[in-house]
Amino acid sequence: MEETILQTEFDSVSRQTEVGHSFKRKTQTIDIEGYTTELVERDGILFAKKESEISYPKDGNETFFKIEESSFWFNHRNNCIVEAVKKYCPNNHFFDIGGGNGFVTKGLEENGIQTVLIEPGVQGCLNAKKRNLKNIICSTFENASFPNNSIPTIGLFDVVEHIENDSDFLKSIHTLLKEDGHVFITVPAFKSLWSNEDVDAGHYRRYKLKDLEHKLKNAGFTIEYSTYIFSILPAPVFLFRTIPSKLGLYKKSNGNDKHKNAHKPKKGIIARVLNRIWKFELNRIRIGKKMPLGGSCFVVARKKWA
């Protein structure tokens, strides 16, 4: 029954697909059966045999698909991720869990990092297919039935804040990783920046860097690198999101328009200032130095040897 429902949704949405963007480097197909045999292939996408509920807006993937390519936020986050992966483990298969429309997966592939997208939302997987991605799994990582100690590298990019019991989730990620495997994580920073935007996005929390590090250590990881990124964003987020939410002035607007305005490319002197800040942050990541403040936390952790 669940498989029939999933097939109906897939068929309905797949009629909307079109040819997407080309790659700088050709995407290579990864032998997913070397990791799990519990998936069913349909039209180039591997599906789990069951579905699970997730804390994410139903139209979230489609909304962000329209803005990711031009968004300063998505592009800078991608650049930060690529720099870190190239520094800490560039040669392993990378599993982008909860990877949405495949924007991060695409960025990693363009930089020669063979990547598997794992995304539970059908629309996100179809959007990833438009981007010519070859290794797409429509599933939560739990439903994909990967064996313990099987995955070399995992990315959780703005995923953990959507998980109600994040401590148990991180322990399950630790179990999934091979010995000495890495996990790369981004999450929204600072509880003091909480706003109705977080509620709308399906977030359970925001993090201080030390709190995320503590949870990872309790799950059995060692911290290889940690920093804040988007160092300029806390002030505008507090002024234009947090304060209006606390004062009851927040107005829920059309999601597409709201995100389009927030993520639109900046011009003139603002663009030049932001570009300087982004270059500074990328250089800090490249040389393994921290930034003391930012709108997001970024952590690279390693599974300790038993």
Model-predicted regions and their roles:
Residues 157-160, 186:
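Residues lining the SAM
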Residues 221-231:
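Conserved S-adenosyl-L-methionine
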Residues 167-182:
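A short glycine-rich, Lys/Arg-flanked "PGG" loop and its adjoining helix->strand segment in the class I
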Residues 236-276:
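C-terminal helical/coil "lid" or tail adjacent to the Rossmann-like core of SAM-dependent
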Residues 89, 109-110, 164, 178, ...:
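Short conserved AdoMet
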Residues 1-149, 153-157, 168-170, 268, ...:
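Conserved N-terminal segment of class I S-adenosyl-L-methionine
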